[in-house]
């Protein structure tokens, strides 16, 4: 089942300024080509790789998925499962679980791997924390994951809105465990402000994804910084030693085993407790191409490597995502639901 690295794929990185993208309008989503055309990089001449047998998504029957979608729309809530085109959406929705995305559906970043829309976001919805808390209570969730788009337009990066959501959930569902998956709060003074605000009502698990190895950041995460993300994770852990920290990395963007192992060592050196490792899947032809499909044996090797480094929980597999079975991941790390 081994698969060689596709070293011959002719990946070319070119300026994203060759085509005039649609103008930004507040609250209007730019997706696919419109989004990536605004990116500092575009990818051309990379052939589409055939998905191997181990990349399979189970689509369950029944009305659970549609019922949950109706409940979300009724409460004007958004899930990252839908906005980011997660391959596990049918499985999670059929079990009544979802990762809620706050602060709107429009991101200020243009990461080449992500299917969330880019644009000029609207101001935060002041009613969202109450709506989210009501939905969590109505669904009877014992564990909830709350994430957001990047909000570089906000002075605190959206930290206060996270706290408002955490507080609202704790009020209506005091026994529910809360994991937040945050942006990097990058910008002058923004990390300081965000950490100060998050300390007012911290979550049970703090998650921020490193996403890829440092050498690939310019192409994969333009606008982000590898060391900044590591520092955010370490500083939160230093302020809250008893709260589990978590991060995630995608494979298949052109990284090597040695680079992935080095990134895992960096995460442990910055006091990250939990790690998720999964296969990158290209959401549209405009996005970063899949350079290689890593094998199940390689994921198992990385799981063993992560355990040897001392992570409290390692979730490593082709279909693993940051919030996929997050409750089980947290339980494996000692966070009781």
Curated annotation (Swiss-Prot):
Entry binding sites for [4Fe-4S] cluster 2: 107, 111, 114
InterPro entries: Aldolase_TIM, Elp3/MiaA/NifB-like_rSAM, LIAS_N, Lipoyl_synth, rSAM
Record's signal peptide: none
UniProt-recorded name of the protein: Lipoyl synthase
Cofactor note (record): Binds 2 [4Fe-4S] clusters per subunit. One cluster is coordinated with 3 cysteines and an exchangeable S-adenosyl-L-methionine.
Similarity annotation: Belongs to the radical SAM superfamily. Lipoyl synthase family.
SUPFAM superfamilies, sorted: Radical SAM enzymes
Molecular function via GO: 4 iron, 4 sulfur cluster binding; lipoate synthase activity; metal ion binding
Pathway where this protein functions: Protein modification; protein lipoylation via endogenous pathway; protein N(6)-(lipoyl)lysine from octanoyl-[acyl-carrier-protein]: step 2/2
Cofactor(s) in the UniProt record: [4Fe-4S] cluster
Domain Radical SAM core intervals: 93-312
Compartments in which it is found: Cytoplasm
Principal subcellular localization: cytoplasm
């Amino acid at each position: 089942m081994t698969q060689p690295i596709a070293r011959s794929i002719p990946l070319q990185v070119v300026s994203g300024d060759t085509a005039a993208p649609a103008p930004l309008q507040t609250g209007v989503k730019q997706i696919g080509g419109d989004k990536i055309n605004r990116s500092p990089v575009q990818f051309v001449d990379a052939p589409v790789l055939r998905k191997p047998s181990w990349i399979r998504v189970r689509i369950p029957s029944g009305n659970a998925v549609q019922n949950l979608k109706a409940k979300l729309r009724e409460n004007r809530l958004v899930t990252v499962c839908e906005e980011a085109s997660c391959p596990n959406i049918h499985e999670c929705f059929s079990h009544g679980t979802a990762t809620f995305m706050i602060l709107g559906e429009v991101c200020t970043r243009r990461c080449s791997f992500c299917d969330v829309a880019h644009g000029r976001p609207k101001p935060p919805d002041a009613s969202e924390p109450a709506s989210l808390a009501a939905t969590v209570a109505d669904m009877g969730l014992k564990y909830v994951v709350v994430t957001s788009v990047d909000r570089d337009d906000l002075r605190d990066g959206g930290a206060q809105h996270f706290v408002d959501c955490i507080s609202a959930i704790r009020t209506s569902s005091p026994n529910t465990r809360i994991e937040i998956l945050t942006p990097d709060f990058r910008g002058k003074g923004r990390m300081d402000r965000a950490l100060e605000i998050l300390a007012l009502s911290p979550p049970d698990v703090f998650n921020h994804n490193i996403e890829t190895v440092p050498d690939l950041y310019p192409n994969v995460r333009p606008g982000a910084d590898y060391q900044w993300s590591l520092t955010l994770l370490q500083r939160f852990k230093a302020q809250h030693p008893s709260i589990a920290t978590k991060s995630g990395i995608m494979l298949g963007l052109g990284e090597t085993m040695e680079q992935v192992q080095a990134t895992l060592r960096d995460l442990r050196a910055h006091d990250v407790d939990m790690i998720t490792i999964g296969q990158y899947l290209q959401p549209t032809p405009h996005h970063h191409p899949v350079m290689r499909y890593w094998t199940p044996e390689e994921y198992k090797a990385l799981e063993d490597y992560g355990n040897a480094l001392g992570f409290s929980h390692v979730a490593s597999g082709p279909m693993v995502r940051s919030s996929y079975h997050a409750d089980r991941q947290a339980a494996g790390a000692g966070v009781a639901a």
